[in-house]
Amino acid sequence: MKINDELFDYFKQAGTIKHYQKNDIIYMQDDHADELCLVLKGRVRVYHITKNGDEINYDVLDKGRIFGESSLYENAYRPTTVSAINDVEIITCHLEDL
């Protein structure tokens, strides 16, 4: 999901900026989901790892895109893994901060 400028500014005020290098894992599937993420710079890959270790690509996200929507559900766990394609800067917002 891509967000408008007003929501983008709100995210910047409420969240925490984090930096990741190429190939860093931002989060793994089955991690507890308690925050939304917004891409500020760079690109991230969203994918699922099957039981036999195969990776199924779901999406590539860039600036202005939100991911981690599974955190909107109480006691949710991440259904996907997200990793940095290149150097990435994101904002993370815990649900209670939104």
Range-by-range predicted roles:
Residues 34-47, 63-65:
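Glycine- and acidic-residue-biased ligand/ion/polar-headgroup-sensing regions
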Residues 26-31:
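Short phosphate-coordinating micro-motif centered on Lys-Gly-acidic
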Residues 1-25, 61, 66-67, 71-72:
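Cyclic nucleotide-binding regulatory module and flanking cytosolic helices
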Residues 59-98:
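Cyclic-nucleotide recognition modules
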Residues 44-57:
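A short beta-strand-loop-beta hairpin characteristic of the jelly-roll/cupin
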Residues 15, 33-34:
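Short loop/turn microsegments at loop-to-beta-strand junctions
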